[in-house]
Amino acid sequence: RTICGISSGGACAFNAAWHGPEHFGRVISHCGSFTNIRGAHNYPYLIRSTPRKAIKVFLQSGELDADIVTGSWALANQQMAAALDFVGYAYRFEFGTGGHNLRHGGALFADTLRWMDADT
């Protein structure tokens, strides 16, 4: 099954897959809040220090994504992508020029679903 979310919902979708990969093996996160909000900033370290799980991940963010006191969404998503790459996850990271919205992610969504269904 695939789980999807934007912003805190994107981090929540990843959290659900991380803790229940037998239920959700594919995650789509648009502008995921992997910043210092309820511990989501810890995921890059957890990914790097935990044996790889059976999860396929799509991340999307942009250079104008949110940047507030809890952190930079653009940098946080780049850190997530780097951690996933480090461990050898099947992942895709689309980094665009947009902000904290679904314009970019929505434009990619059909292709994202095709990629999610493809064997990696």
Regions found by a protein language model. Give the residues of each.
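Non-catalytic cap/lid and distal C-terminal segments of serine-dependent acyl enzymes
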Residues: 1-120
